[in-house]
């Protein structure tokens, strides 16, 4: 491609549309990261090289904690602007639900941004124990999820220790436990109630909101809870109203509709006498993983300002209309805070090129399928391309059937494939996406005629949402972007599972079934970046084939450059085997017995013993040495 340029690289991989200013391409063709507005752009390949020099191996998760602070600041600024525009005096708190990424480096970095404008959310006892320590004195803690007596007691202890804990009632039975424990500890509880909205935000996570939601009270249950609480000494403790419209809401109209309904609950509960001081709108703020700026499930058609305005405006109008004190607005936008800050870097271990196809020499005893395919190939420049491909598909299938029935041998079977792929390449060269009738065939050919890039990582461990819910993540080679990619490829991982593949790729502000990639150069590592993986992926990842956590580094960027602030070694084989119940001493003893029984020379026995020990204590992933 003679017209290739850095701008063409940016466009091909849709970088300006999903990167939100944090990632770009420099003149050397490297992906660069700019975590802070006034900081330098740092070469991602150089960061990876420095991490490897310090002992890290690929696959490698690279975290930029400065981006976390930037994301939080942008969210707070958007609500400050919206509240100013709507003359709203209630204030705003950005709560981080640590389920999104509980790692200390993530939750701790966000929690270090002290102030009334930040809080934490827990959905389980272990998470609660973490946030009780992470929270600033007097900090806001929202306690969600299913609760037993111990969970409630711990939350109330937090209240007694000066933290602003709110226990959100999500099941009617929880209120009785809260009242009993509050009296036992002699502490006034901070209570919230989660409502089930009828409004439903469309998307992959839509059942986290609406009538089918796992959590929350119905209108009748909300009324019954208030009637029960009203007759106790804690009637003025119901201070937080919580609801959830969904996660990764793509369409801003869904947010507006949900807020319209939720505001009615705020007005009605206030009219009944509840002292609602906080309205927690939950999560929902999406990320444009695709860069398509659309209502697609992995995209969004709005920005931060629009999101904030659609939350502030209904509450501002309701408070003015009904003479109510504006409540503090709380959001739980963990995805928006964390997604951008982490990038997974993995090396290509091998490439299986798509069949090129060739025309074999003719033979007198050729089966009918081969003769027909040869005739089609001879007419590639004469007859309509789509018609030729359809005929080729028919005779290719006929040949496969004949082989399965034992009517032709392996040599003929191979020649059938050779001819079919030669035809496929010839047909693709004649088709154009500008012709509507060509598009279905082009789509099929682009899926067939692609290389397989086997990448040293596990889909199930590092990007599990790709497998679980067909989530889309931007994927970009982190170097050589000043060169035109010569191939199209799909990415397969190292697991022994056919689901360990990426099937959808971000390209040219759209989605495709393959990705432009480069030919590998002998002696060079070809490294690919998986972007926007900072939310949920680490926590949801599993250990399929016993591939464990990857190595990880935290990179801090300032005006003088960057430094690797923290390095964490990934899981080793012995750790994974111990996790699934293997006794390491027994394994070592068994290896030793088998070496002894093999009657090897002392030198060879020592060599094999050392190799087995290295395998047992080594990284669970493949070597990251360059190919060739």
UniProtKB/Swiss-Prot annotation:
Residues that bear N6-(pyridoxal phosphate)lysine: 99
Highest taxon above the source species: Bacteria
Enzyme class: lyase
Catalysis performed (reactions): L-arginine + H(+) = agmatine + CO2
Entries under Gene3D superfamilies matching the protein: 1.10.287.3440, 1.20.58.930, Alanine racemase (3.20.20.10), Lyase, Ornithine Decarboxylase, Chain A, domain 1 (2.40.37.10)
Molecular function terms from GO: arginine decarboxylase activity; metal ion binding
GO BP of this protein: arginine catabolic process; putrescine biosynthetic process from arginine; spermidine biosynthetic process
Alphabetized Pfam families for the sequence: Arg_decarb_HB, Arg_decarbox_C, Orn_Arg_deC_N
EC numbers, comma separated: 4.1.1.19
Keywords: Decarboxylase, Lyase, Magnesium, Metal-binding, Polyamine biosynthesis, Pyridoxal phosphate, Spermidine biosynthesis
Residue numbers binding substrate: 279-289
Cofactor: Mg(2+); pyridoxal 5'-phosphate
Family statement: Belongs to the Orn/Lys/Arg decarboxylase class-II family. SpeA subfamily.
HAMAP family, sorted: SpeA
Protein name, per record: Biosynthetic arginine decarboxylase
Gene name, Swiss-Prot/TrEMBL: speA
